[in-house]
Amino acid sequence: MADPAASTLSRLKNKSKELNIQFQQILILFSQEELVRRISVSEYRDNFILKGGYLLYSLNNQSFRPTIDSDYLITKLPMKKSKIDKVINNIIKQNTQYNYVNYEIKGYEEISAQMKYDGIRVKLISKIKNTRTHINIDFATGIDYLIPKPKTRNLITILNDFENPKLLTYSIESVSSS
């Protein structure tokens, strides 16, 4: 394949037409999907538990997702900006077969005033060729255990032949009650 980035963008455009979803929404989903893939191959994969809307999308194979954020519970890591910055920089530099997706950190925001638990929002820009897609990643702490325990799942992909990321997730029961 001469230009895998161009090919992927073309396929994502076709997928947006097929599903009758705006191309920008598909780019958001794909950017989140690739970030999950990079988390899943990082040394921090066991410190992140996916929860919230992106998890529901991944479980239900919904063809849309209304927000630009994905939510994670962080375990066994301090919730300090300096540590989160180190972790995120490590994750976005992970090698996958889709290294033409590049991420840039745009900023951090404390979210404790908006959430039940302390946390940090990381604002990222995902770049594929000339596209720039804004996504937010919300990290929360405050729960040391989940009942039932988190489960490792293969998450869906937008393009069927792309590698499915595998990550710890909330249980269905925990997602329903959160």
Task: Please annotate each region the language model reported.
Residues M1-S178:
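Compositionally biased terminal segments of proteins
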